[in-house]
């Protein structure tokens, strides 16, 4: 997907994964496609709050890095990425192991309300800031509850009259009413 977009002139992409060790796999896979492996660059190479100075490439980071908030004069990692990509970005954002963003919308637990996860909220902030981005959710782990799918707003399941459900709350209600078969 990234290579297809690259060949169409969209020369910036973001790859978010659970572990920084997976960058070696990402570089190997990118190289196997005939591309320069060093074009896959870790966000950790750039200090938080400083500009990302890549003209093009695949920015690799972890969910733990993505959730880094503003710190004094240093902007959040989400803002740093958006500044690099530009608000009109229409390239690819890969959420590898996307289930790591589960509980992005919070919900109800056995002991009451459950706060939204920081990783999930950061993933949603990135998606909201880049409405034209081509978002890919990759996960072999199924959601255990419908609330855990709040991060996956780009699936087109809720969001207005052009979607099956007007809101995420309507989607959650319908799936919960349908039971296990609906999941």
Language-model-detected regions and their locations in the chain:
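Flexible, glycine-rich phosphate/dinucleotide-binding loops
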Residues: 22, 144, 158
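Conserved AAA+ ATPase small/helical "lid" subdomain
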Residues: 178-183
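Conserved AAA+ ATPase "sensor/coupling" helix adjacent to the nucleotide-binding pocket
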Residues: 152-158, 174
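Conserved helicase ATPase motor motifs in RecA-like P-loop NTPase domains
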Residues: 99, 126-150, 163-164
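Short, amphipathic alpha-helical segments that act as regulatory/interfacial helices
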Residues: 27, 150-153
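SF2 helicase/translocase NTPase motor core
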Residues: 1-122, 162-176
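Secondary-structure boundary/capping positions in well-ordered alpha/beta enzyme cores
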Residues: 12, 37, 133-134, 156
């Amino acid at each position: 997907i990234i290579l297809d977009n690259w060949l169409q002139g969209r020369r910036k992409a973001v790859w978010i994964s659970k572990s920084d060790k997976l960058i070696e796999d990402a570089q190997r896979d990118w190289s196997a496609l005939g591309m320069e492996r060093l074009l896959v660059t870790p966000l950790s190479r750039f200090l938080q709050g400083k500009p990302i100075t890549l003209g093009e490439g695949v920015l690799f980071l972890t969910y733990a890095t993505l959730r880094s908030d503003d710190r004094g004069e240093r902007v959040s990692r989400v803002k740093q990425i958006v500044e690099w990509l530009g608000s009109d970005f229409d390239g690819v954002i890969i959420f590898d192991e996307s289930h790591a963003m589960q509980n992005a919308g919070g919900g109800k637990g056995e002991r009451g309300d459950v706060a939204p996860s920081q990783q999930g909220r950061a993933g949603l902030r990135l998606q909201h800031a880049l409405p034209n981005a081509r978002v890919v959710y990759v996960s072999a782990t199924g959601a255990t509850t419908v609330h855990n799918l709040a991060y996956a707003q780009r699936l087109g399941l809720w969001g207005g009259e052009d979607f099956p459900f007007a809101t995420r709350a309507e989607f959650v209600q319908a799936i919960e009413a349908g039971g296990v078969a609906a999941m």
